[in-house]
Structures are given as C-alpha cells and as structure tokens.
C-alpha cells in the first residue's frame, strides 16, 4: 500500500516501524523498507506515560524490553541499531519525517481494531508529508478479510466453519528470508555517540516499575530465544510420527523450555516459520503425506480469534458486542479479588493464579480451569473481568486471543457444544496426584499429605497441626461449595440457552444435564482445536445430545446481527435465574 509515489532508487530514506513482529526473520515489511534504500532506520515507539499508567504487569513489560534489547543486539551485528522513540505515534512521526527526511515508511499489518485505527491516522500523516507507506502481512497466516469474504462477509463463529473456509484457501505464504549484513551495507546511517541516551531501550525502573525483590524471568524475551525454542520444540515432536496427543502430567503445568506462545504474541517468532517447520517435519516423518489441519491447532485457534475480532472493536466486552450472548453475570468485587489473588481456598485454583502472577504464563488447561471457576462454574462473574486480569498478568495475552478464549470458555460465544465444568479438586488430583504443583506455588500447604492436598479443609485437625497450616487461619476455607454452586450455575446456563433457542426455534446447544458428572479417565494435553476435554469436564449423556451436524448447521446459519438480537433476550431478570444473588 502506497500513500505517495515511490522516490527514485537510491534516494529512498526508509523507516521500518516495529510494533509486533520483533524479529529479523520472515519480516516482509522490513525487506520492503530495505529495497532500494539509501538509508534505513528501525524504530520502536514507546510511550513512557502509557507504561506507567497501563494495567499491563511487570512480567509482560520485562519480556517486551528483553525482546527490544535482543532486536537491538541483532541489528548491531548488521552495523545498525534500534531507535526506541519516546512518545505517541501521531506526535512522533511528523517530527521524524522532517528530521530524517523520510521518504518511505514500512510496517507490519495489524488486524486488530485499535491497530487499524492507529495505522489509518499514521497513513494520513504520511500522505500529507509525501511519504510512501508499505504494509505487509506477517502476523497471521491468512488474509483475514479474505476468510470473512468467503464466509459471506461475516466472520465464521465456529471453529469447524473456520476450518472449512481455510481448507478452500491457498496455503499460507512461505516465510521470507532473514535480513543479512550485505543488505544493510548500502543503507547505513550514522549512529550518534549519545544513541543509548536518546534512543536506547529503557529499563523497567525508567518506566516506573519497582524491581527490588523481582524474581528472575522464567521466560526470556527475544527472537534469539524464540528460534532456539522452536528447534527444541520440534525435537520434542517425535509424537508426530504416530500423532498421538501427549498425556497431561504435573510437568506439563510448568513453564517449558520449548513453549512458544509469548514469542508468537510479540512476533519474536514468525507464525509462518512455525507453520512450515511443522509442515516439513510432518512430511519427513510421514513420507510426504499432507499434514492434517489439526497439526496446527495452536496456530489456527489463534487465527480463528483474530478473524472474529478484526472488525469488532467491542470484542473484549459484552455491551455492543454482536457475537456475545448477554448473560446476566453477578457483580462481586470481593470474590473477583480472591480469585485474582489466588485466595479462593481451592489449592488447585490458587496455585494456578499464583503461577500466573509470578511467571506470566499458565498451561492452557490450567487457563480452562480458572476461567470456568470464575465464570459459569462457580463464581458466576463476567468473563470481562477475567480478560482484564489476564491482560495484566499473561505474557501472551492480546486483544483477540484473550477475549476470544474467555468468551469461548464462558459459553458466551462460539457455540460451545458441551457444558464443561472443571472440578477445582478432581481435575488437579488427576493431573498431579502427588500435589507437587500445588506445593511448589503454595508452599504453606507442603506439609499436607497427598490425600488432602487438593481439599485441605477435609484434613483432621491433627493433620492440619502437623502440617503447620490451619485452614481458615493460615490458608482460607473454600469460598464456595463447588458441588452446589456448579449445579445451580449449570441450571442457570441451561435456562439462558433454552430461552435463546426458543426465541427462534433453533436448538443452539444440546440439553444440559441436571447434575455434575465426574467422569473418570485420563487427562490429555490437547489444544482446543483438537477437541480438548478432560476427565473432570461435565459432558452431556450421548442420548441427550442433539446431532452435532444439525447443531453446527443451525449455528453457522446465524448472521452476526441475528445472533445479537437473540443474545439480548437472555438478559433475564434475577428471579428467573435459579441461584441468582441479589
């Protein structure tokens, strides 16, 4: 996309604007900035005031700053530097255009509503200054607008429908080559002696974060770490040979040296590189057979939520959100605070929230457990509150995936087929019978025997004294009776969906069981796109389920506007909802 005519070759003074996409590999916008350029400056715009006032926590800021340091180090090896410019983009660019004589601005396409609005303002400023603008897509695998177009100009609202659409599309573009020193030789710029003072990567202290007592980072930011992790990740993929889901265990809950989600979120790792490295590995192992879509579950769910959010600026809230069912959640700030601070009295939930606050990451099934507990499982608090807490604490949280996941897990959108209800005792016990995970993050409970580690309130007083932890004194009592509240909340959700279905005469969801089933069986470490479920999920009896095909067809026929009309009828008055608190 160009906002002005391209300058003659050799006279182009380029600026590449890093936002996400914090990498030199597979960066088509950076390659475009280099093409025919006489000079190139790579910038990142950071507003210190925003950093000090935003709700984003210290772990995510640290990861970002580490990623910028790594990017600067990589550019140094190419005889260049990263220019971290302080301020707002709309204030910064008019000054830089004049000061540096910029003739071309390149950046990666941002599909999220806020990003598109910001970029439109910068494109306007560039056009007024006679600066060519080049935008390339590399943060998503597909052209999201094309997916929407193929779905009748509306985003697909089920993952199955999304898969059907992309299966008709061309494969994602292959990653472009990494930047090499020869490309930078002809477009060097003078680096001033005071560069670090003026354009250096700031410290956490400069951004207003206290660092006394800050534990070492569990996740090291940056492209260098991302590529090393990718290699390790693929080495671990021996299971691809038989394509068996890995079994869930206590070690699965800990931060893995092969984990990639924060690196994909910040663009330290290209999703296209990840996609094609998986592709190559599968074809090597399977002797050139075509990889199934399920191989890319992590990437495709990410793509699904990006598609759903791209034209929906209200995607992270209920009000005005055309795809969100308007469920009458309770407002309970005290209960929300206990959940967010890991003080619910359920060790499994509290250990997860403690890990999240300390490290900035939790396993995706742990996310399911705490999301269910906050929303439809136990506390009946809006998913919007969960979005805000995760946005503060989670390294890989972004607008689309974070909000989309919370709507999905709370049964507020994307047509959940089953009413999973993760048991805050049984799920943890099956995953880690010895309770090592709980003892790691809640050391005050380490004296309890495994028998009581997930429900210490049931331990005899003598056991509590021996463990030096009295429940109700040293560790809180459970804030709810899970068996009772989960049954009530399932009934509330059942009423909501029954009324929603009656409104147009469609069965959007299967009928809901009147009691919680606690099924036995192994827990599998599967992604949502691979049909994730656990032994502690509430599943519907097979005899009570509507045909999955019929349900999907009915759901997918709904256009966004029709769904919103239906969703509004679920704002039931309190007396009509069993268990509704005043």
From Swiss-Prot:
Residues covered by the Photolyase/cryptochrome alpha/beta domain: 12-141
Comp. bias intervals (Polar residues): 527-546
Co-factor binding details: Binds 1 FAD per subunit. Binds 1 5,10-methenyltetrahydrofolate (MTHF) non-covalently per subunit.
Alphabetically ordered keywords of this record: Biological rhythms, Chromophore, Cytoplasm, FAD, Flavoprotein, Nucleotide-binding, Nucleus, Photoreceptor protein, Receptor, Repressor, Sensory transduction, Transcription, Transcription regulation
Main location: cytoplasm
Keyword presence, Nucleus: yes
TM ranges: none
Induction of the gene: Exhibits some circadian rhythm expression. Levels increase slightly during subjective day peaking at 10 hours. Levels decrease between 14 hours and 18 hours to peak again at 20 hours-22 hours.
Protein's cellular compartments: Cytoplasm; Nucleus
Region (Disordered): 521-559
Biological role stated in the UniProt entry: Transcriptional repressor which forms a core component of the circadian clock. The circadian clock, an internal time-keeping system, regulates various physiological processes through the generation of approximately 24 hour circadian rhythms in gene expression, which are translated into rhythms in metabolism and behavior. It is derived from the Latin roots 'circa' (about) and 'diem' (day) and acts as an important regulator of a wide array of physiological functions including metabolism, sleep, body temperature, blood pressure, endocrine, immune, cardiovascular, and renal function.
Family: Belongs to the DNA photolyase class-1 family.
Subunit architecture: Component of the circadian core oscillator, which includes the CRY proteins, CLOCK or NPAS2, BMAL1 or BMAL2, CSNK1E, and the PER proteins.
Protein name: Cryptochrome-2
Species, as recorded: Gallus gallus
């Amino acid at each position: 996309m160009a906002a002005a005519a391209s300058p003659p070759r050799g006279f182009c003074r380029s600026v590449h604007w890093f936002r996400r996409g914090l990498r030199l590999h597979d960066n088509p916008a950076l390659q475009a900035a280099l093409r025919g350029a006489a000079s190139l400056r790579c910038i990142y715009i950071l507003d210190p005031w925003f950093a000090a006032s935003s709700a984003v926590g210290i772990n995510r800021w640290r990861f970002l700053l580490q990623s910028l340091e790594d990017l600067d180090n990589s550019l140094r090896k190419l005889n260049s530097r990263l220019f971290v410019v302080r301020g707002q983009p709309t204030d910064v660019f008019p000054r830089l255009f004049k000061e540096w004589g910029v003739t071309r601005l390149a950046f990666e396409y941002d599909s999220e509503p806020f990003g598109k609005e910001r970029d439109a303002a910068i494109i306007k400023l560039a056009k007024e200054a006679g600066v060519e603008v080049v935008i390339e897509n590399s943060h998503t695998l597909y052209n999201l607008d094309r997916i929407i177009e193929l779905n009748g100009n509306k985003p697909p609202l089920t993952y199955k429908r999304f898969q059907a659409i992309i299966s008709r599309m061309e494969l994602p573009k292959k990653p472009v080559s990494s930047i090499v020193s020869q490309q930078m030789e002809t477009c060097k710029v003078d680096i001033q002696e005071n560069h670090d003072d003026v354009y250096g990567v700031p410290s956490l202290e400069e951004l207003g974060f206290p660092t006394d007592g800050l534990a070492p980072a569990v996740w090291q930011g940056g492209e260098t770490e991302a590529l090393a992790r990718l290699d390790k990740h693929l080495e671990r993929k021996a299971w691809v040979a038989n394509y068996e889901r890995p079994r869930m265990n206590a070690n699965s809950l800990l931060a893995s040296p092969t984990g990639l989600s924060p690196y994909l979120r910040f663009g330290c790792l290209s999703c296209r590189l990840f996609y094609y490295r998986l592709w190559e590995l599968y074809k090597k192992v399977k002797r050139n057979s075509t990889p199934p879509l399920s191989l890319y579950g992590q990437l495709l769910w990410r793509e699904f939520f990006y598609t759903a959010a791209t034209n929906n600026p209200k995607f992270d809230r209920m009000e005005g959100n055309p795809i969100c069912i308007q469920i009458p959640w309770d407002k309970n700030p005290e209960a929300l605070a206990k959940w967010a601070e890991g003080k619910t009295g359920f060790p499994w939930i509290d250990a997860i929230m403690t890990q999240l606050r300390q490290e900035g990451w939790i396993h995706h099934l742990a996310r399911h457990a705490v999301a269910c507990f906050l929303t439809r499982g136990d506390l009946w608090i809006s998913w919007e509150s969960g979005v805000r807490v995760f946005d503060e604490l989670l390294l890989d949280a972004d607008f689309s995936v974070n909000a989309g996941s919370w709507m999905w897990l709370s049964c507020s959108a994307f047509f959940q087929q089953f009413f999973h209800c993760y048991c805050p005792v049984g799920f943890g016990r099956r995953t880690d019978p010895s309770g090592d995970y709980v003892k790691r993050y809640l050391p005050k409970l380490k004296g309890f025997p495994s028998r009581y580690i997930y429900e210490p309130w049931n331990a005899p007083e003598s056991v509590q004294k021996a463990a030096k932890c009295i429940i109700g004194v040293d560790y809180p009592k459970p804030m709810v009776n899970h068996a009772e509240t989960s049954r009530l909340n399932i009934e509330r959700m059942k009423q909501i969906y029954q009324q929603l279905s009656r409104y147009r005469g469609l069965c959007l969801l299967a009928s809901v069981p009147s009691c919680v089933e606690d099924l036995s069986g192994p827990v599998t470490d599967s992604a949502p796109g691979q049909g994730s479920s656990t032994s502690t999920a509430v599943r519907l009896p097979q005899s009570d389920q509507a045909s999955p095909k019929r349900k999907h067809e009915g759901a997918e026929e709904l256009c966004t506007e029709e769904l919103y009309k239906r969703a509004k009828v679920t704002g039931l008055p309190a007396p009509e909802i069993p268990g509704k608190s005043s």
